[in-house]
């Protein structure tokens, strides 16, 4: 927490950023996108953000950052239509400037000695380069209503991008600039939106120390499901965000399990850029996918509060079990079997809990993987209850779960309060009734966060904390109460209805 706060606090995304994202195939046209949005609506699937992949550029690899006139003949009209339908647009880009871009001649003096994919590499450490590029982005994207970016191929862990011998006008060594590049691009683009008093939310391939304050979520082309969970968990130790995005699956079971995981992550996204998959690609689990996607929308008040705690207090919204109070299970050491070739020194292997995590203050998520019929879940100290039923699950112990339905194991701590919106495929700026769930038999308190959901006015004090409390008398009777501060505005909630899940 102190590290996150030292670097400016965690990012508070716009409320729409916590909805469901869908990245469309790279060569989609404006009409293709509209049909895709229509199909989401027809099938009752939530959709908040459409991601456009490289084909929106007139040329990509390297990029022009200008619209392809054949696929998007009226980009301003298209962007407005999407906004009118409560759909934000997020644009893919990489840093490398095409000679066919109108910005090419302006940026050329502020680029490196070597190209990448024959594209010029802007020196984003220089204010002059940042201004030239962001002026171009404003003209062709931001001023049209584009809500954010997916910034690819700026992960400079080796010389795959540009060689160590490359030089840049700032004088920063090539190796250092590779490692700074993702952070510098985040800084430059966030500044554009701050100037408009609009929050953005997007994806980035790389970051470095101190980028937790930027509203970008890390991703890459890796696709092992278990590895994705490990990355999601480990990100919390360094104050950054990670998404285990869904792209494709071999079976409907794997499809469902990946979707269930991503809907409890910082960005709930299906990335169909290459193969055109849809949430309903596997018909036998379509209803289950719809259910978890709608639950994602229901959880937005809870998730938004978790991100507010990230911004104000430094608490990661998704975090490793080691960061949960009362969690004390030590890593187990298993002796390796002596083998003259494979293990000549009988090396030991440490088994750690890296397949379950906390979301927000009260929720524990234990994903399932394709082929699993049961799994072990480590419950921290105190009593824990099933999210879906409210039934007692265990107390400070390791339990074995055999799912009776298609849900993944999700638990809530004793006294935990979970605020939920209605299940809806679209949401806007209006107020919605809130279902306030309470689990277990202990009294509970929860500080629900609210603001306008889109601007930086919360930094000036324009936000509200609603105190949700549940008391339990001597006979075990529960009573819920919501206290709104006098004189404070409420943006998102019209009423508070308490539901006691554990009777």
Model regions and ranges:
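Catalytic-domain carbohydrate-binding cleft regions of carbohydrate-active enzymes
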Residues: 1-406, 452-455
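Accessory, solvent-exposed terminal regions and/or long lumenal/extracellular loops of proteins
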Residues: 407-503
């Amino acid at each position: 927490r102190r590290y996150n706060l030292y670097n400016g606090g965690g990012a508070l995304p716009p409320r729409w950023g916590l909805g469901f994202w869908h990245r469309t195939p790279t060569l989609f046209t404006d009409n293709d996108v509209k049909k895709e949005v229509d199909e989401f609506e027809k099938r009752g699937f939530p959709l908040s953000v459409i991601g456009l992949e490289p084909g929106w550029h007139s040329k990509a690899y390297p990029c022009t950052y200008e619209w392809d006139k054949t696929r998007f003949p009226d980009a301003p009209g298209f962007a407005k239509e999407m906004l009118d339908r409560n759909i934000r647009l997020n644009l893919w880009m990489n840093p490398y400037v095409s000679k066919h871009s109108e910005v090419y001649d302006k940026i050329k003096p502020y680029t490196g000695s070597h190209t990448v994919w024959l594209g010029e590499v802007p020196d984003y450490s220089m204010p002059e380069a940042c201004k030239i590029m962001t002026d171009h982005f404003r003209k062709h994207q931001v001023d049209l209503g584009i809500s954010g970016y997916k910034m690819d191929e700026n992960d400079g862990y080796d010389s795959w991008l540009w060689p160590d011998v490359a030089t840049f006008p700032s004088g920063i060594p090539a190796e250092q600039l590779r490692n700074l590049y993702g952070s510098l691009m985040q800084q430059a683009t966030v500044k554009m939106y701050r100037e408009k008093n609009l929050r953005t939310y997007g994806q980035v391939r790389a970051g470095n120390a101190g980028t937790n304050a930027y509203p970008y979520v890390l991703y890459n082309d890796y696709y092992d499901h278990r590895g994705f969970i490990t990355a999601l968990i480990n990100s919390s130790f360094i104050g950054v965000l990670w998404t285990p995005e869904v792209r494709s699956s071999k079976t409907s079971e794997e499809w469902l399990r990946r979707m269930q995981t991503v809907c409890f992550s910082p960005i709930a996204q299906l990335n169909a850029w290459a193969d055109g998959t849809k949430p309903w690609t596997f018909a036998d689990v379509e209803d289950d996918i719809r259910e978890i996607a709608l639950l994602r929308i229901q959880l937005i008040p809870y998730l938004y509060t978790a991100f507010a705690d990230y911004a104000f207090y430094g608490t990661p919204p998704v975090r490793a079990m080691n960061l949960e109070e009362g969690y004390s299970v030590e890593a187990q050491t298993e002796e390796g079997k002596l083998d003259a070739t494979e293990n000549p020194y009988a090396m030991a292997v440490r088994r750690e809990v890296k397949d379950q995590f906390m979301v927000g203050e009260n929720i524990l998520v234990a994903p399932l993987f394709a082929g699993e019929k049961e799994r072990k879940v480590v419950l921290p100290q105190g009593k824990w209850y099933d999210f879906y039923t409210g039934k007692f699950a265990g107390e400070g112990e390791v339990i074995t779960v055999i799912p009776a339905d298609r849900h993944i194991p999700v638990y809530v701590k004793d006294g935990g309060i979970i605020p939920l919106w209605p299940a809806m495929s679209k949401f806007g700026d209006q107020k919605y009734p809130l279902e306030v769930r309470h689990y277990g038999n202990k009294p509970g308190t929860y500080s629900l966060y609210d603001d306008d959901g889109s601007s930086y006015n919360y930094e000036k004090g324009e936000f509200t904390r609603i105190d949700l409390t549940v008391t339990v008398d001597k006979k075990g009777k529960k009573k819920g109460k919501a206290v709104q501060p006098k004189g404070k505005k409420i943006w998102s909630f019209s009423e508070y209805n308490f539901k006691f899940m554990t009777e």
